[in-house]
Amino acid sequence: MHTIYVDNNATTAVAPEVVEAMTPYFTDIYFNPSSMYQPARQAADAITGARETIARLLGGVAASEVLFTSCATESNNTAIHGCLRAQPGKKHVITSAVEHPACWRCART
């Protein structure tokens, strides 16, 4: 039997090439990239390299402008708060009931 998964909003299967690329960081280079010891530097270097690659792919973006977040909620909150800070004179956020709760909760605060 073949499974058809239709809840990709919650989670989705990881592409095999992503699993292959990330395996070293789940098994061997799992260190805190903010630490000062050598294995941690490997993790930090990998993050720096990923940030530079993404900036290059986006074009016209500095690596320092690429932010990594831990989840969709954090990403949504960062984007919404960033837009609000960029437009301090604007006092309203328009959203709808079909938005993800992370978006409308953030908009309400």
What does each of the following model-derived ranges do?
Residues 1-109:
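Pyridoxal 5′-phosphate
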